[in-house]
Amino acid sequence: SKLVPLNVHASLLPKLRGASPIQTCLIEGDKKTGVCLMEMVKAMDAGRVFASEVIEIPEDMNFTSLEEKVSDVAINLVLNKLPLFFEGKLEGIPQDESQATFCHYITKDDTELDLDYSIDKFINIVRAFSVKPGAFIRTMNGDEPLKILSCLPYDDKSVKKGELKAVDKKHLVLGLNNGQVLITSIQKPGKKPCDGSSFINGMGSEHVILIKHKTEDIKND
């Protein structure tokens, strides 16, 4: 009998073949993803699918929590389905090539946030890289990277694009091109993550920090 090499892939194939399915489904704002038990073939993630399980993605889920969920589901899928595979009770279903999508290796550039992103895209990218490596913005003063680990939509027209502002001494708000987000977890280089009000306490008399546009960045990394 022919040997069939198997692999577990963290998406609902043929969607999101490639190296970063967990991050990419969060960036794209998907409401569900999954895990597939699949045949390994020469083409990347293109083999027959023998079993799969859907994972719902709530809005507050980030990379860390989704990766943990994927790991749990993958272990259970293998434990439950592998015996059936060896008994010849699982049929390998060919993937629909016309529905295939792909995801790439994550680079540092992917994790830098852009003030021109829509609010949804900005929040989704924060989710996709939280807690590690952390999506970041850069300050005008000293080019200091600040990692944004969680944020929410917020409405305060007084906060202009490119301003990271202390509002009412307790709300840390960042102005984007088409609105604002409330920063609920942020991290300075070499420091532990903190909530917005703790960050504001560390700002002292400074109540606005100016943030660089991604396009202004000098690519010298």
Language-model region placement:
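Donor/substrate-binding cores of folate-linked one-carbon enzymes
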Residues: 1-102, 109
